[in-house]
Amino acid sequence: MKTLFVLLGMFVIYPCLYAQDAELQACREELVRGMSQKNRDSIAAAYCHLGEYYAYRQADSTRYYCEQGLKYAATDKAEPYLYLLNNLADAYFSSGQLDESLKRFRFVLEEAGRLHWDEVEIASVLSSVGVIYRRKEMPDSALVCYNRALALLDNREAYDERTQLLTSIAILYTNTARLKEGEYYIRKALEVSEKSDDMDMVMYAAATAGSIFTLRENYAEAAQLLYPVLAK
């Protein structure tokens, strides 16, 4: 029976590993093509994609590929230049280097203004800055960033970004013992998440809501919360 469970586990894991290997191979081939064509835009984009591949796997690799990509990226247009800058700042955050990450996210915002980047992307950067301030125990500064981001997303169908942002605000209020405000914002996040196609964001909001409802001693709703999420 133990052997059967091991084999079943392998059948589940192998397709995932194969998909990851295929994605990585595609990124490498993209870089080779860009190099062979000596196309700086293509090379920068390929390095950007490699950095994104490693974003949740290995922060050091993401930093390396972003730094390489910035050597080729044109600085007079938003993409992939701003994505490389943003991913590099995020890699520093993932490594726990909050001050360096904050400095680099601020530079992203400066360059985003210069290049007139999409407001949804700018809102995402502001949200990241807010998270850093929250981690640095600077709740007022975090809230300023979150509110600026919310204003940019107003009347936009950016459901994934709004879900993440509202959840971050709920966490901020909860961490400062303002549970009533935390519950208000997490309910708004849950409402928006119903229109989101990003299951990670949906689960993020649901898990946070469960914790907040538990702190509010709303155990019944906390227990029932995951059922509709798992049914999606």
Regions found by a protein language model. Give the residues of each.
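Sec-dependent N-terminal signal peptides
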Residues: L4-I13
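A "functional boundary" signal
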Residues: C16-K232
